[in-house]
Amino acid sequence: MKAMKMLLPAAAALSLAGHVWAVRTVRADRVRLAEARRQVTIDPLTGLANRSGLSAVLADLVDEPYDVALVDLDGFKQVNDTFGHDAGDAVLVEVAARLSAALDEVDGAVVARLGGDEIVLVCPSPAPIAGILGAEVVRALAAPVVLPGGRELLVRASVGAVSAMAGDDSSRVLRAADLALYRAKAAGGGQVAEYDRAEDLPVIEQRPVVRLREMTGPARVLGGAA
């Protein structure tokens, strides 16, 4: 009986140790899973939501009105070609930080990077404020971006803005913003265009021409002399 009494504490200790190990393992698995999910929805360069993260946000907003501003940096390719990809990355990081700061106090607002230099702002709002949202983008980018090495670069952006109603299909909303964006770029860039069905639907046929002009026309990002 005495031997049994001595073994009980040891068995209990082993059981407790096993339980602690199991709990720690579960917690570690949860941390890894959370990090994996975060990596799936976050753009690694800018820290913004990525396309998957944006899709999740728009799915949550399906029953609410919201505004979208689709942003494309004018002449961004020239930044990479002239100053290198490190400079291009620095521009993207700074632009992302400024746009995030501009919406920092807006409840539920999200800034996401779709890829390349294309960024989208989503702002839940009971009243249509797409134009105001687009103007905020222009204001946020007014000051020059300082590149590695100290060179200052003035970055301009074209913005396509659209106000979505509750129940609107998110893919159609983004398409509308895209059409407005290309109208802004076709008009010279550096400006905001709000979606207008009468004006933007014909752009579908003109879009290849607009793309050709973007590739062959003058650069729209202005900075110091190369």
Language model segments and positions:
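Alpha-helical scaffold within the catalytic cores of cyclic-nucleotide enzymes
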Residues: 96-100, 129-147
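Conserved helix-loop-beta segment at the catalytic/binding core of cyclic-nucleotide signaling proteins
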Residues: 96-128
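Signal-transducing coiled-coil linker helices
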Residues: 1-44, 52-65
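Conserved nucleotide-binding and Mg2+-coordinating catalytic segments in signaling enzymes
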Residues: 37-56, 71-85, 93
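Catalytic core regions of nucleotide second-messenger enzymes
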Residues: 107, 112-113, 141-157
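Cyclic nucleotide signaling catalytic output domains
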Residues: 151, 158-188, 193-223
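Active-site-flanking beta-strand signature of metal-NTP-handling nucleotidyl enzymes
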Residues: 67-73, 111
